[in-house]
């Protein structure tokens, strides 16, 4: 067993060592952020399989409409967690968001599967890395974001995560598998997740982003023209 305070000792650094080319990554968490993918891009691109369960109903109560959205302006804070949470604002301000979203969507089509809890029943939040010879469980993994990986600062006083090994880790993997394979409690939402992330790079052309950026920089001077 090991512990991570996510300040001087962070979960992300340990995951880069544990996730291998033949690893299977299984996560049960409240939300997924493209910036968590970015933090572990090399490892997730090379892993064998990635499974994610939204622990509360997501993409099932009602479809998110695909109406046109404005490019991100920090003070509006309108993006969903897939595009980054409120504590990943520094990352979202960078014009890399579009590129990250495209890379993430491409990876999802090749490696990832997403399912959601469709019930009102609660579920533990955790991440399991399964390798041929061992397995590691990180808990709690409340959300799969840059904050929960220790890459960014959130609004919690503490952000402690514990890593368990076998045989305890095997129990968490069995729990995940039992939920994953239960059609009465779980629904596949992989295409919904990919479609929503894809809108980031489909809706805003490079030229549009460029001119919106210029507008945000110089708008206060327009009245003087």
Q: Where are the language model's segments positioned?
A:
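PLD/PLD-like phosphodiesterase catalytic module centered on the HKD motif
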Residues: 1-225
